[in-house]
Amino acid sequence: MVCYTNTPEEEREQLQAFLTGKSVHTLALFDHFITEFQKIGPIAVHPAKTMIGISNGRKRIVYITRLGKDFLLVVFPFKRRYDDNLCFEKIAQVPGDEQCNHYFRMLQVEDVNEELRTYMSIAYGG
């Protein structure tokens, strides 16, 4: 299991509860995604009622909205559309806002490739 040093203790307990009962494959995907984000910079993991937010210390930068049987669904909220990519399965503008949510479905650890790492870095610094 990944070390969540920047995540407050009470949120670590919530996270454990959130992850309980998930498949070994899904947990491996989750750990890999978090580990890859930690290579970019320090992050904190914030579980909520229906999703898990990841922050860079200033703001939440991505949201894991679904931990399926064999996948993760991750939303990257950007201020603009990034249409020219192969990693996002859907891009939707938030009504009445400039925010565009970019949806990434992770099925294998290899899905976190150089292209996605570029968008992870944009999210981290944005």
Predicted regions and their residues:
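Charge-dense, helix-prone N-terminal extensions
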Residues: 1-126
